[in-house]
Amino acid sequence: AQYLSAEFDSANFEFFSKTLRGIPEQRERWKRGINQIDASLGEAVGQIYVDRHFPPANKAAMDALVKNLIDAFRERLENNEWMDAATREQALLKLSTFEPKIGYTTKWTDYSSLEIGEDLFDNALALAEFGWRDQVKELGKPVDREKWPYPPQTVNASYNPLLNQITFPAGILQPPFFDPNADPAVNYGAIGAVIGHEIGHG
């Protein structure tokens, strides 16, 4: 409904958002537009975000911070007394295969085949087809371990149990979670808690 006329969009909001979820009023159109661009062209927006807001020094600082916390977690596991030896060995093995993903992908989505025009509905169809083709081309191929769960401007962190990856996009690597100019204790207490939380999922 969001790609159709204002009447459809309004009716959709009245029922699905206001009646079913108790949301009193619809967000401004420009904000919904930003959300749509972020959802549809996330990595294109992400490249701009990284260029403007996430310098290489920030990534290097986070790389070191994550490594230190994984090392500390390993030390705790090695000295753990409530696990039996076999369980501890498996936990250490799993920790040794952790893949931290920090800041942004190393393999950006190529949008060059995507045609965007002036019509919202046509653009929605083109984006849906682009996303479908992107998924279909992966059929029968090995899992792409470089693919990220969300674009770098996302304020979130996650653990992927299928790939044993912890992900910290550039969007969360800003105050109050992370500040490259702050005392290390501040970062260990802020983003460090998030990192520890994600490591703990593993």
Q: Residues of each region from the PLM?
A:
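Long, His/Glu/Asp-enriched segments that create or flank divalent metal/ion-associated functional microenvironments
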Residues: 1-24, 96-202
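Noncatalytic, helix-rich "gating/capping" subdomain that lines the substrate-entry/channel surface
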Residues: 1-64, 68
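Short amphipathic alpha-helical coiled-coil/interface segments
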Residues: 62-77, 91-102
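Functionally constrained cores in energy, signaling, and assembly domains
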Residues: 33, 47, 51, 58, ...
